[in-house]
């Protein structure tokens, strides 16, 4: 419709050279011109041809330049993925040529902040026109039509935009503004997507921490029966004296913290276990832990070895020691929690006289209790363990026992070893966490490994974190394959 209109000898400075694909090979410049001149005057059409043939044959694509940018965009909106030309199976593909990407709008568009609300578009144009031709100027306005104190200015070239930034950024403070004017390149779509993903990641991590709070057992109650059953199994086993070795250690830690703890605080873990059990309507050892006050009094007494005639009391004292070491919700400091790490290392020796099954059961139970301690005090617990585990676990590739090593992928690009450690630490004692880095680009490969010191923690992590959404992706968490398998994972 516009093909017969008068036009200058050259296209406008902001005109776009477009690439067009899915064109019949039999079409010449004449047919193409007839098609495109419906949208505006055409300056040039260049059909790509295969010069190896004689005569050269069309490759089914071309470049086209309109006199105006508007005509090119109208043609693209009407034809791209919309119209199928005769003899073709797919619609026309029309987009700016690669050479045009060097002059993309996002590379020439400026954000102007701290603009006086009394300014209009003409005032902004007058301020920035000395730096070059302005393609577009727009002030952001609210629903009431009032200026929001910021604007966008698009120049015809990037060099003009750079000159404006260099000369105008923080050069003056406009009327009614508290800070100097801000002039910078506007956020690109990629920048906006990155910010959005970062915000989503922060929200997801906050939700993860919130889900681990003592008062919210949603993410933990499904695991509670495992740990409570293990405690119950140990407490009711025939070899009750095997637990008595924990008593002196429990008493030592208990008396060391009496200034910050009381009987109610010592029962917090038991109450937590009982609450988790109640959420599942499952009877548990939590009731046994809270039903007797004698273990609590024993913990604050001297560390003398208990009599073999009081095996049941010794058992309860030992479980009480686990309570103490797992921590309380008030009056507890980082040094108190530090005892948990030492306790973990001494657990095996304290059970040296016990049977293998009892030792294994209590070891797994302790891992569960450690998780509940993280639930009760997520921020303090993480602070303590990050200072201890972080020294050796983050970045190392030390493996745990069979069934305790996890393979995690779909990690965010910006995640490092410490981030991975912090995310998986609430489920148990992490012996190593490693995000793999591409040696060529020094960027994350978006997968990594986490190893625990026991399989129960690994299963807890899988249950809670597999499918956990971060940004646009969902984590995939699975057990690392055995060394005997042919594949590493």
UniProtKB/Swiss-Prot annotation:
GO CC term, one of those recorded: ribonucleoprotein complex
Function: RNA-binding protein implicated in the regulation of several post-transcriptional events. May be involved in pre-mRNA alternative splicing, mRNA translation activation and stability. Mediates the rapid and sequence-specific cytoplasmic deadenylation of EDEN-containing maternal mRNAs following fertilization. Binds to AU-rich sequences (AREs) of jun mRNA. Binds to the embryonic deadenylation element (EDEN) motif localized in the 3'-UTR of maternal mRNAs. Binds to RNA containing several repeats of the consensus sequence 5'-UGU-3'.
Keyword terms: Activator, Cytoplasm, mRNA processing, mRNA splicing, Nucleus, Phosphoprotein, Repeat, RNA-binding
GO MF term list: mRNA 3'-UTR binding
UniProt domain RRM: residue ranges: 16-99, 108-188, 404-482
Record text about domains: The 2 N-terminal RRMs and a part of the linker region (between RRM2 and RRM3) are necessary for binding to EDEN of mos mRNA.
Gene: cugbp1-a
Record region (Necessary for oligomerization and EDEN-dependent deadenylation): 183-210
Gene source species: Xenopus laevis (African clawed frog)
A Pfam family annotated for this UniProt entry: RRM_1
Gene Ontology biological process terms in this record: mRNA splice site recognition; regulation of alternative mRNA splicing, via spliceosome
Record-stated family: Belongs to the CELF/BRUNOL family.
PTM (free text): Phosphorylated during oocyte maturation and dephosphorylated following egg activation. Dephosphorylation is calcium dependent and correlates with the increase in the activity of EDEN-dependent deadenylation.
Gene3D superfamilies: 3.30.70.330
Subcellular location(s) of the protein: Nucleus; Cytoplasm
Phosphoprotein among keywords: yes
Quaternary data: Oligomer. Oligomerization is required for RNA-binding and EDEN-dependent deadenylation.
Chief localisation class: nucleus
Name of this protein: CUGBP Elav-like family member 1-A
